Amino acid sequence: LYDVDGSSEEEDEYDVKGGLQASWQFLDFGANRKRVSAKRSTVNSVKYRIDYQRRIDEVENFYEEILEVPFNFKVIEEINLDYDNLEYAENSNELKKTWRKRLKLSALDGYASKKEINDKEKENDKLSSDSEIEIESRLSISDNLKDFFQFNSELERSDWFSIYLNTIVTQFDPHTSYLAPEAKEVFDQNISGKFQGIGARLFKRNQQVEISEVIIGGPVWRDNLLNVGDIIIAVAQSLDEEPTEISLMKLSDATDLIKGEKDTNVYLTVKRVDGGIEQVEITRDIVELAETYAKSSIIKDDTSTYGLINLPRFYVDFDDYGERNAASDIKKEILGLKSKGINGLILDLRNNGGGSLKTVVDITGFFIEKGPVVQVKSIGGRKEILRDNDPSVIWDGPLIVLVNEFSASASEILAAALQDYNRAIILGSKQTYGKGTVQNIINLNNVISGNTYGDLGSLKITTDMFYRINGGSTQLEGVKSDLVFPNRYSYIDIGEKDLENPLNWNKIDPARYDNSEKIFNYSQVILNSKNRISRNEYFSIIDQHAKHVKSKQDEKTISLEYSSYKDELENTKLQNDKLKIIEEFSSPYLFEWNEINFNSNNAYDDDMKEKRDRWIESLKNDIYVDEAMNLLKDINSIKRNDILSQITID
């Protein structure tokens, strides 16, 4: 059973927001908890206990001392952000100096933001002095650091055991990892798009577990039992059980108490937003995450109808392939769109980090007659060709595939196969992510005999590399787009090649396949699109912004003097304001939700409507989708002309 795991974690690493912002985000702990956790997975637990914890304690002891003294933003000094090449502090005094600058940078950011808001409120006489704004900025930093140290103190031996093992296994390649039982559960949830529980997302703030979102369709939503902002005080598994108070627990431990198998009950002691306290009985159920699943839109112009399918992930239930999965859903979407009489199809794989390899093979088969889809080579050199053995084709019309730098793994297999068969035009970034490896999940409980330590978790280990049917690997190189769109990452290297210890690219012999039949004039369509892009004002603005992002990334120092810092902020704001013109773009095409997705539950449909409407609106403002539509129209126009040119009149 293959799993082609995606790169969703890596995506956070490349949320480029310019050099000015990137450096202080580590202090905004509430917004970056996941990133902090990911960074810590590279820390050796032994070294942590001996050295890292000592440094953590040291910083915890002196950061408040630094923040007690007002920062002078008139002093001309700067901070070096080239952390990879910085020397370690030689002693405690040097370490403290480094932290003073880091804290000052974060305070300067808060100071500049609050001062801008304050100056705009002059007309309402809601003015604060500069010193008051500076104090408020330091207090905000202090609160964030308290959250960080609290999070650090909640880590248990099992957490550091997991970190220690991952320190070892990630030396082999970036996708081999140890999954503790809790991490394996999250992995399964992400790849299946569902879990068993109450249907609410939680977060921890000020030692309280709070509801951040009620998931549409879940038990809590169905019975209107909880609301955003409610605080869970205690948890019990039965009415007879003494509730367990959870405020001092790690959030993950509290979540474990709340989640459970379908049709079991949990009793939550809840403090409502209005202050009232009550016990709520909830029957757990399977909760589906709608944002994981495929969805589609009908696109119309004056003369034709087209379709677009968005696939966020190649989801599957590994325990039961017959359950809902990406392939079965895509098939339904295609058939639904065909019933509307579409003349072309766009398959949107942007930001799709991967998933199940079997679903990739099945989906590829919807667009080709039977044949090889991908080659898989194991560690021992054994090669296997995974094939579509079904001669039926569900969609044989014009096909466009949208990709970007975060289309990874399984997405790359699908895009590569369709490209090798000349079955689709690939539109998007210069290349996709570049993950060409296959992982298998090994349950360590089945491997280690005589285990007396409980659930040992699993090992996600890289066992194979996959290759295109033309013999090339997507490792590091990804899939090259047939037509490259400018985007904000155009001048930045993003993907597998930027990770530590990636495997090298190589190639093998091609599989036997037939790519002789094209359904459109490939070269003419591409040329037409390139000409449109070169004349398009919006794409020109995007390209200019991408160059600005690259220049900010290359900056190694930032001024800690307010006037210089403000000048840089204003320059960045000016560049961002130029990009806002893209928001004014509105496609001439008409976009509608494909109603095959409607649930039989009317209340569910009503509550999902807002999310559906937001997605449809985003398509109207998506310049990349608009150009994909232009290509589909070109394809059909050329096909019609080819047919007419072959007609003779005697």
Residue ranges: model-predicted function:
Residues Y52-E87, S142, F149-K204, N265-Y267, ...:
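Extended, small/polar residue-biased N-terminal targeting/export presequences
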Residues V4-D12, G19-A38, R49-D51:
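A glycine-/polar-enriched beta->alpha junction
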Residues N32, V36-D57, N61, E65:
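Heptad-repeat alpha-helical coiled-coil segments, especially the extended periplasmic coiled-coils
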Residues S92-L95, W99-E132, L139, Q208, ...:
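Well-structured core secondary-structure elements of compact alpha/beta domains
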Residues Y52-R55, E60, E64, E68-D109, ...:
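PDZ/PDZ-like domain segments forming the peptide/carboxylate-binding groove
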Residues Q150-R157, Y178-F195, K204, E210-I215, ...:
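Cleft-lining beta-strand/loop regions that shape enzyme active-site pockets
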Residues E13-D15, D263:
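Membrane-spanning beta-strands of outer-membrane beta-barrel proteins
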Residues Y111-A112, E116-E123, E134-D143, R468-R640, ...:
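Conserved functional hotspot residues or short segments at active or partner-binding sites
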